[in-house]
UniProtKB/Swiss-Prot annotation:
Keyword Oxidoreductase: no
Domain S1 motif, chain residue ranges per copy: 272-340
Domain of life where this protein originates: Eukaryota
Main subcellular location of this protein, as a coarse class: plastid
Entry's Gene Ontology molecular function annotations: RNA binding
Entry-linked SUPFAM superfamilies: Nucleic acid-binding proteins
Gene that produces this protein: PTAC10
Cell location: Plastid, Chloroplast
This protein's name: Protein PLASTID TRANSCRIPTIONALLY ACTIVE 10
Transit peptide limits: 1-40
Modified residues (Phosphoserine): S434
Amino acid sequence: MQICQTKLNFTFPNPTNPNFCKPKALQWSPPRRISLLPCRGFSSDEFPVDETFLEKFGPKDKDTEDEARRRNWIERGWAPWEEILTPEADFARKSLNEGEEVPLQSPEAIEAFKMLRPSYRKKKIKEMGITEDEWYAKQFEIRGDKPPPLETSWAGPMVLRQIPPRDWPPRGWEVDRKELEFIREAHKLMAERVWLEDLDKDLRVGEDATVDKMCLERFKVFLKQYKEWVEDNKDRLEEESYKLDQDFYPGRRKRGKDYEDGMYELPFYYPGMVCEGTVTTLHLYQGAFVDIGGVHEGWVPIKGNDWFWIRHFIKVGMHVIVEITAKRDPYRFRFPLELRFVHPNIDHMIFNKFDFPPIFHRDGDTNPDEIRRDCGRPPEPRKDPGSKPEEEGLLSDHPYVDKLWQIHVAEQMILGDYEANPAKYEGKKLSELSDDEDFDEQKDIEYGEAYYKKTKLPKVILKTSVKELDLEAALTERQHHNKLMMEAKARGEGYKIDKLRRNIEMDEYDFLHWRRSLEEREALLRDISSRQALGLPLEEPGRYKPGSFFGKDQYDPTSALYQYDYWGEPKNSEISKQERMKDAHNKSIVGKGNVWYDMSYDDAIKQTIEKRKEGSTLASQEEETESEEEEEDDDDFDDFDYSILSDESSIGYSEQQPLVNGTQVLTD
């Protein structure tokens, strides 16, 4: 499409110039006066930035970019200690404080802009006298302050004894009682200190007093029982590992090619045991993993900024001495063995502690409180409901009563059909009836719709298998009642069935449930009185908190404010709909509901008819006046519909009411 007929000569930058991306000062050529035909277009919003604009709208923070970044890193709890940036990211960092559409000011930003060109980077690498690979390797060097070497000081020589674990044997494993008693005597000898000088002296002389305190014989008996347990459970543990852990990662059980004979299982270790190991993995957010000769690697919790100094002392492949601080369930916790470094000792460098050891969430975990108690974690605070269970009413509705009622109705329906159509059941026994279709318990409820007195209502179909019914007993019961009814009719008396067999069974279930609820109430009252007498808390500490603990405007699923929108719960029930229609009808007749007592119903009808006639004549007169005004003066305000400002009696039925949130709102 040709917009301008006048030919114009525009000059464009030369694309063959390789330095066209280099920022230069803006050069303005003298304006040329060109006569143009009037054309409709859009002017550019980009104007050169002057100094006053930068003073008004420029960044007013006194902190430099590096200081602001450092403060942000400290507040977040983690910082990139040595940033490894690409040339593009480095230029973006150093040009943040530069203005837009203006030449670069700082020499760092100008140098970073030059480094965007590969030719300039190669030139700088050549000037430094290194290869390109060496230059890239230099970007990954640690450029921060390096601390002095860490020296672990000892109070004296340390003697380690081989002590059997206190939790031996594992659950479900039976051992010889006398051997177990002999093994557990080692725990009594732990209170006696073994000095290195006494041990050397006894070994030279040939005495066994100090050597017996080392519990070597008891530990050998434990090793014998431990090896028997490994032989019987090794294959089972490996199968469970493949079933629960699809992929291997540090801290989990080694299996397949990684497993070697002689690796120690978890029952071999106990908290407080000191081991030698090798660092295998370092993880920024989890910590260090140490191989101590077992099927599980030990986990040293380290995270975040603590690695800034620790990384200089703990490296992959170094030999360390560690102490086991905790042994946990491998099926619930991710890392069963928790360690601490003894040599080199870095306890004084760890500040960011894990709140809780990481755990697994399995498919069968449905109760979060049970998981929390399993892991030894405190309860999650929740709002105090304010209800007292000891003051609530007793329960008397057994949950199985609904199923019994469903079975009872199905039995009576089949018996009714049996009496109405005896030919259909001729030659058949009720106990031998079978389902017409394959019964599926997952699909025993069907939802649909049905009409009742010209009203469409939701319908629920409950399917029951014939195998669950006791039709023979129900038929015998009905025949007995029919016999009694015939006898009473012959005597000229009436007969009324009090309760059927299934009704009596339902009452028994309800009474059983009520009795159980009563016993639970009595047990709860005894527990409350005992806790109050001993000064113990009535609830789990930290489980419930007052409403002020959570602040204001917290989500409450029980409040209608969070179930619907801001307008509240819409009233779409049948009763409220009839009330709205009645109010709208009254308004259409009288106009206001408070004038019913001023006149009779007939007078009100006549008055509304007259008002409607007057309204129609006024409307025709207004149309004539509007047409005349439009001819005289074309004004936008003439299109306004003044009929909406008429009397309230013009408001008709519920169809004319305004809709708010899907609900018809009545206006007074």
